[in-house]
């Protein structure tokens, strides 16, 4: 059941209830390039500030702030509260994202963790070896921990700026490698650089973490309770001499992620209807609790803390720590300093070498049981961008080194950040010069991704728009009354005009608990499909989402010149209900609970459904399709603007 999309024609109109929710500011805040720019700006401000007025810089960050409760108090300077207090929330966000990948992403197949894990370890050992080669036998050898870490936030931002446009696999690989680094770094901070170690306080912290696991296993979902336990763990770890940022990472890894269940969403909708009929404080609390319980704790916490961590906390950290007085004396000393040279070569050479060598050896030694999720160019790119240690390297440097050695390490970290960024740009620039098929293999590799769509597309059964056979298939579970489906519709249409080798599949998922006319509209579309006009009816229904009553449906059928008696009979007998129920069952199998939900070549699409995001997912799928024997041909993705094309569209 296929229909062709008119070529050479763009839809500029929006459905009645559709509106563009994106603004330039919102788009900026939802990109990693935005946070990377803010971070770099903060670093520049710190360098300018300390070189113009060092006394005011140091007096601010050295100011002591205390928290007192009776006779008990905690006193630290402002730099500590940023480095070990606010940065706990940054590590919380990192832990949340890794846990989400464990629960819903590629790492839910645990075997896929092995190679990034070993690559991360390789990316730690090689830099340490290079740093120690420069500093062996010197007091500065104690700073070997400085070269271990990757600044996850800045590395991801630089990858978004310098890397290929369609880099989800690349991003996930980098994230896993970087988090392995962060976990090991935290262990090293605890063991190698403790301040006034207290085993008893560490034992108390371990007990608190165990309590968190117990109450989570018991199904307790009271957020303030977890917050109090997190604060208690932070205080205990701080008293133990270990950097308390570890608490954020551990709590993030403890916070599970899941797709909202449709039953939970329906229950929340039922509570809202009760509140609508009889508003009261008790029902208001019930509605809030129902809405919160439908979403995973991981999603809720990421939504709260990710913007703060990216746009406030990490830039504040850079502002507090990057400041170093750069003068001729320091530069002359750094040019020959084993600390500076050790840090520079460890990050620019050691990081990529360790990651690349480990990624090459693991598949060979495991007889391809553990394969890289990306290609060789992407592995090299991940290696080079992992050489951006920046904020995390500065964090360790403040623990490991002091005095002139600390300033020399900061110079090395800053120069290494620039060097790693330049080599990353060069790697992806060279990869971009490869022929398309070779470039796809170099960036994506040959490993298969996880398929999320449980019921495969059947062109004889499904409603297909575009070519019957295509290298890329976009499946949408949608609801004709859903306003968000209306917002997605213009993007889908533009996608099909831009990429003529894509086939688009509509599957019904009427959310009858919130959209009273969605089921009837879906059945009307099936009634039109019986007469060869599914897509014409589909377009009318989405264009008039506020007009889906029975009389409206009959008016649309008349406008399409359908046999009205046959159309009425189809609706009266509810002949399309069984077909719609099959789509709903298929949605349940794929853990689809809301609309619109998109799948691109079987992979669930996470994120916005605007034309930019969908185009990125489609182009990534095209690149992967080229690696398969049946997808080796180069598709004509883009139609030429202004070409003569028919104005009318065949039916189903």
From Swiss-Prot:
Subcellular location: Cell membrane
GO molecular function terms noted in the UniProt entry: sodium:proton antiporter activity
InterPro entries, sorted: Na/H_antiporter_dom_sf, NhaA, Thioredoxin-like_fold, Thioredoxin-like_sf, Thioredoxin_domain
Biological process (GO), any one: regulation of pH
Membrane topology: Multi-pass membrane protein
The family this protein is said to belong to: In the N-terminal section; belongs to the NhaA Na(+)/H(+) (TC 2.A.33) antiporter family.
Protein name: Na(+)/H(+) antiporter NhaA 3
